[in-house]
Regions:
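Amphipathic alpha-helical packing segments from all-alpha helical-bundle domains
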Residues: 89, 119-122, 138-165, 176, ...
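Short, basic, alpha-helical segments at the C-terminal edge of helix-turn-helix-like DNA-binding modules
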Residues: 82-88
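C-terminal peripheral helix-coil segments that are non-catalytic and often amphipathic
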Residues: 1-21, 108-116, 152-153, 157-161, ...
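Helix-turn-helix
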Residues: 2, 33, 37-75, 79
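Amphipathic alpha-helical segments used for helix-helix packing
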Residues: 104-105, 118-142
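Short coil/turn segments at alpha/beta junctions that flank glycine-rich nucleotide-binding fingerprints
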Residues: 44-48, 99, 120, 165
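Hydrophobic alpha-helical connector segments
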Residues: 79, 90-123, 174-181, 202-205
Length: 217
């Protein structure tokens, strides 16, 4: 067990916060600062190489300030994962629910993710790199696979609704097409986080939307 993975002995049992505030703590805004910095560094370095000391240095905090909010690196990673899932995946699916058809649902999901990307690219970077970390670290696998399954089921559900509505042919292989679309969407996440600019991402989504509704060619 590394130093970052060990629980903080001074932490109150059953609570993530300790009594009192260490230097440089400032309530929720400090916690969000830690989460964003951790999200950036987990994406850049991977789970294994990222340390509390590096997070504290980049965030302009002390290591005790990080420990004030998070007992261990796994605790912090879980909080970063949950934040990314809420802001990207959950928000995207909520936006898609209001769309009237399959192209609209998939486009709405991607546009919601793009909006988050315009404000903070570290979300796309973390979600993409989290899958890679899940293959290297068994303790991270369940959450990453659950998130992937959630997106997979969203896509499959949209396809089944499209079949029932007569938007696509009835003999469509939902499983195979779902995997294809998940692969495309994961690739867009990689593109958003590490390759293209935000304007380029918007253009990619526009073209993908046209591909879905049959107006690209």
């Amino acid at each position: 067990m590394t130093e970052d993975e060990q629980p903080v002995r001074a932490a109150t049992s059953g609570s993530r916060r300790r009594r009192g505030r260490p230097p440089a703590s400032g309530g929720p805004s400090t916690e969000q600062r830690i989460l964003r910095t951790a999200r950036e560094l987990f994406s850049e370095l991977g789970y294994e190489k990222c340390t509390f000391s590096e997070i504290a240095e980049r965030a302009g905090l002390t290591r005790p300030a990080i420990n004030h909010y998070f007992h261990s690196k796994k605790d912090l990673y879980d909080a970063v994962f949950e934040s990314a899932e809420d802001n990207v995946v959950t928000t995207g699916m909520a936006s898609a629910a209001a769309a009237p058809d399959l192209p609209g649902q998939l486009t709405a999901f991607l546009r919601a993710a793009s909006q988050v990307d315009s404000e903070d690219r570290s979300y796309a970077r973390f979600i993409t790199s989290a899958l890679l970390d899940a293959f290297r670290h068994p303790e991270l696998r369940d959450r990453a696979h659950a998130q992937l399954d959630e997106v997979r089921e969203f896509v499959a559900g949209s396809l089944r609704e499209a079949i029932e509505a007569g938007e696509v042919r009835a003999d469509l292989d939902v499983g195979a097409v779902s995997e294809m679309l998940v692969a495309v969407m994961w690739g867009m996440g990689l593109y958003a986080g590490f390759v293209g600019t935000h304007d380029q991402l918007e253009s990619v989504i526009d073209q993908f939307s046209r591909l879905l509704d049959g107006s690209l060619w």
